[in-house]
Structures are given as C-alpha cells and as structure tokens.
Amino acid sequence: MCNNEAKMSELLSVQSDAPAKKINLMDLTRQQMREFFKELGEKPFRADQLVKWIYHFGEDNFDNMTNINKKLREKLKAVAEIKAPEVAVEQRSADGTIKWAMQVGEQQVETVYIPEADRATLCVSSQVGCALACTFCSTAQQGFNRNLTVSEIIGQVWRASKIIGNFGVTGVRPITNVVMMGMGEPLLNVANVVPAMEIMLDDFAYGLSKRRVTLSTSGVVPALDNLSKMIDVALAISLHAPNDELRDEIVPINKKYNIKTLIDSVNRYLNVSNANHGKVTIEYVMLDHVNDGVEHAHQLAEVLKNTPCKINLIPWNPFPEAPYAKSSNTRIDRFQKTLMEYDFTVIIRKTRGDDIDAACGQLAGDVIDRTKRTAMKRQFGQNIGVTEVN
C-alpha cells in the first residue's frame, strides 16, 4: 500500500470508529485528497477543485464552492471540515511586522508576518514549544508540548493570508516567502512539516517557488539526510557557534550531532538540491563576548571553507532572565569584516518586530504542559528531543 493510501485508510478508519469526528481537509495534500475523494466514490479531480477553493480563494465554507454540485457539498459537510487555527492575539509593530498568537487546541503558537519593500515573509511554527533547549532562545525556555499537525502548520499560512487579504484592497503586501523558523524544530516533526510544505509548493494551492520556502534546522542530521528524498526546499542552518565546545553549551543537540557531522550532511543536501542556488544559509546569533570575537570568525571561516553558503549574523534579541547580552555594533561589524576577508557573503540581519517580541529567538507562545520536556530531559540529559529517522 502506498503512503497516500495508508494515510487515507488511517483517516477513514478513525472516521468509522468515531463518526462524530470529521476529517480536516487541511491535513491532506492534494494527492491524499484525491484518495479521499476516491474513497467517497467521487472523481479524483474534485480534489483539485477543493484545494484551489481552500488556498487560492481562502474558502472554508463548502456552500460557497459554486463549481461543486449540491449533493457533493452535502456529502462533504457530513464527513469533512476545513479548519485552520484561529487568532487568539494580534500585535502590530511600528515597523509593519505583525505577530499572531494562533490557538492550537489548548495551547498557542506564534506566527510572524514580516513585510519588506520587495517581498513579505511569513515565519511559521512547527511545534508547540521546543525541546532542543538552545540557551539563547526564548521558545526553548517555554518547554515542549507536542508537534503541530499538517492543518495547524499550513493553517497558519491560510489564516495569515486571509487576514492580509488582497494587496490592492488592504495595502498590505501578500506573502511571497515562508520560513519554517517559528517555534519548534521542523526536523523533529517531519511527518507533518513536509506535507505542509508540499501544499505551499502546490500550484493548485499557494504555488510558492521551492526557493521561497525555507526550512531552518539546528541539525537533526538523520532527518536532514532524508529530507532531500521527500522534498526540495531552501535550507538554513542554525549554527551559532564555530567549535564543538561552545556549540555543545548553547545548542545542546550538538552533543548528538557535532559540527562536522552536520556540515557533512548539509553538503550532501546541497549536492542534490535545486532550491538553494547552490548555497545554504548559515544563521549565527551574536552573543556579546560569547561567540562574537575575531577568533570565532576565523574558526567559522575554517568550518565553512568547503560549504557554499551565505552567513546571516543575527543581533541577539533579549528575553527575561536570559544569561546573555547583545553584541555591540562594533563587535558585529568586526566579525562581519573578518568573514568577508575570506570572501563569504555576510549579511547583518535587520531586527524586525522586537517591540512586540516577534524578533528572532523571542517567540514563546503559550505552552501549558511542560511535563514531556522534563521527562525527556531526565531520560536523555541535554540531548532532549532527538528522534532517530530511519
């Protein structure tokens, strides 16, 4: 049985065991939705129509889908629904950035819209909280509760698109790029992140270019090695340190997959990817007198000498009780210039949305149950949240 058929059988078996529970069509890729319609005794092309209604037109009411006959609409209403996360809180920054706290069950995750002159980027969450315990990140301090479902991930894009609306009417630039850089580690939720990204790329849905969908990871190497077999999207690596001793401290997953292991995996991905223009994005948060010295820049250049990349230097964004300080502009500039001497492309990322705690590393959401992270920490020590991928 193929993966799509297995998925549909699982969904439909749940449906038969619990008739009151409807299938959320946002949990299905277009191919899975075609299988769903076949199970209903309908033509598979109906899936193409549904996907276009849901994502192109932002429609979640079957009655408004005028090219679908009434009998089928009634059948769909009986067994299916179209349900995206609702906005619990919206905050708007003076610089145009918008942060939404999206309600997912009893918890909330955060989604950030970042408009620029020539594009608009949506930063999407993949988990409720995060289990990786990076010491400089607010999300990690909230603990971990669970993975988001496909509908909770793609639903963030749907909800944001619905709010932003038509550029000609609202004056707000439509979403052109999606980055999986919100709450959570995407490669610890591959089963739901990949289908959500497939919907982003689908021409019947959002039709984004693979170069405009970026997955950011702290380095879950087995999942990264498998990623290219599942989907081709742009890749960003949350590196943040140039040596294992320091990275073990601030990005604890490094104890499981060290820098060399991670960079080797990145190079393998680049060898088969068409989405990255031959380069990976390296993310490096600047922590005052921790990882921002000239010696660190030289070490980073050595680590990346055989990896085509561009380097984003990210001014650290404070959060309560954090043990760090923000690097001075002088230290960041010196770090950049040192790397540029090695002919790297180095960009100092402009901080956006920090007045509403929407900047990099500040997303926290509302993680009610932290017991899972505590239990995982007891079992694995600092290597929490690491799942082997076959």
UniProtKB/Swiss-Prot annotation:
Keyword field: 4Fe-4S, Cytoplasm, Disulfide bond, Iron, Iron-sulfur, Metal-binding, Methyltransferase, rRNA processing, S-adenosyl-L-methionine, Transferase, tRNA processing
Class in the EC hierarchy, top level: transferase
Pfam families per record: Radical_SAM, RlmN_N
Co-factor requirement: [4Fe-4S] cluster
Binding site for [4Fe-4S] cluster: C130, C134, C137
Reactions the enzyme catalyzes: adenosine(2503) in 23S rRNA + 2 reduced [2Fe-2S]-[ferredoxin] + 2 S-adenosyl-L-methionine = 2-methyladenosine(2503) in 23S rRNA + 5'-deoxyadenosine + L-methionine + 2 oxidized [2Fe-2S]-[ferredoxin] + S-adenosyl-L-homocysteine; adenosine(37) in tRNA + 2 reduced [2Fe-2S]-[ferredoxin] + 2 S-adenosyl-L-methionine = 2-methyladenosine(37) in tRNA + 5'-deoxyadenosine + L-methionine + 2 oxidized [2Fe-2S]-[ferredoxin] + S-adenosyl-L-homocysteine
Domain (Radical SAM core): residue spans on this chain: 116-355
GO terms under cellular component: cytoplasm
Cofactor annotation remark: Binds 1 [4Fe-4S] cluster. The cluster is coordinated with 3 cysteines and an exchangeable S-adenosyl-L-methionine.
Biological processes per GO annotation: rRNA base methylation; tRNA methylation
EC number: 2.1.1.192
Disulfide bridge positions per record: C123-C360
Active site: E110 (proton acceptor), C360 (s-methylcysteine intermediate)
Subcellular location field: Cytoplasm
PANTHER family, A to Z: 23S RRNA METHYLTRANSFERASE, RADICAL SAM CORE DOMAIN-CONTAINING PROTEIN
Function: Specifically methylates position 2 of adenine 2503 in 23S rRNA and position 2 of adenine 37 in tRNAs. m2A2503 modification seems to play a crucial role in the proofreading step occurring at the peptidyl transferase center and thus would serve to optimize ribosomal fidelity.
Family affiliation: Belongs to the radical SAM superfamily. RlmN family.
Additional free-text comment from the UniProt record: Reaction proceeds by a ping-pong mechanism involving intermediate methylation of a conserved cysteine residue.
Protein name per UniProt: Dual-specificity RNA methyltransferase RlmN
Source organism of the structure: Haemophilus influenzae (strain ATCC 51907 / DSM 11121 / KW20 / Rd)
Gene name per UniProt: rlmN
